[in-house]
Design a protein with these regions (language model features):
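Beta-strand-rich recognition/accessory modules
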Residues: 153-158, 168-176
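Accessory low-complexity/Zn-finger-associated flanking regions
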Residues: 1-58, 183, 189-196
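Generic structural signal for buried aliphatic residues
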Residues: 66-72, 163-170
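Short, Lys/Arg- and Gly-enriched loop/turn segments at beta-strand edges
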Residues: 79-85, 177-186
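Eukaryotic modular interaction domains in large regulatory/scaffold proteins
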Residues: 137-164
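Catalytic cores of histone-lysine modification enzymes
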Residues: 17-18, 27, 38-147
Length: 196
């Protein structure tokens, strides 16, 4: 966190407010590997699995209780420039899918253009299969570990409430409103009916 304190509590659960940049301890720190400010860099430890859904394709679900505030998974893939993402995005749109995730934390904070995007099409982790929900149980945070460039955060997903075993893991894609191109199948009571 910017204040110099840990973004996590004693149980390793996020305590930083949404939108707060998270700076974890790294190779430049004198602390040990078990430092409580080294959560995302330890990797996946949440009890999750990939499964097939009826309407949304592949998805991810909890296999055991995930307590609120717990780190769940990092969105990984190939880091590309935004210009390359625009080119690839046209192809992906024509094919009816996209696994592009803009690394726009710095641009959102300082009003500049987003420089990089993660493409999880060919190189990816489990987070590629997280689906949208209008009432999500995960929220993404920008996390910096060894790379201090504000343009290159890591994207980490944390539970925003307790997640029951068998429950699908979701986040809000936050697509721009106005279009009516892809129906939403999240099933939430507050469903907006359309992704974009």
């Amino acid at each position: 966190m910017q204040s110099g304190g840990s973004a996590y509590d004693a149980h390793g659960r996020i305590q930083a407010p949404l939108g707060t940049p998270i700076f974890e301890c790294n190779a430049a720190c004198m602390c040990r590997g078990d430092c409580p400010n080294r959560i995302v860099q330890r990797g996946l430890s949440a009890p999750i699995e990939v499964f097939k859904t009826r309407y949304k394709g592949w998805a991810v679900r909890a296999t055991a209780l995930i307590p609120a505030g717990s780190f769940v998974v990092e969105y990984t893939g190939e880091v590309i420039t935004t210009d390359e993402a625009e080119r690839r995005g046209e192809t992906y749109d024509a094919l009816g899918f996209s696994t592009l995730f803009d690394l726009d934390a710095a641009s959102t904070r300082n009003g500049t253009d987003c420089e990089y995007t993660i493409d999880a099409t060919y190189k990816c982790g489990v987070a590629r299969f997280l689906n949208h929900s209008c009432d999500p149980n995960l929220r993404q945070f920008s996390v910096w570990v060894d790379n201090v460039s504000l343009s290159l955060p890591r994207i980490a997903f944390f539970a925003i409430r307790d997640i029951a075993p068998g429950e699908e893991l979701t986040f809000d894609y936050k697509y721009a409103e106005g279009g009516r191109n892809l129906a939403c199948h999240c099933g939430a009571k507050n469903c907006r009916k359309w992704l974009y």
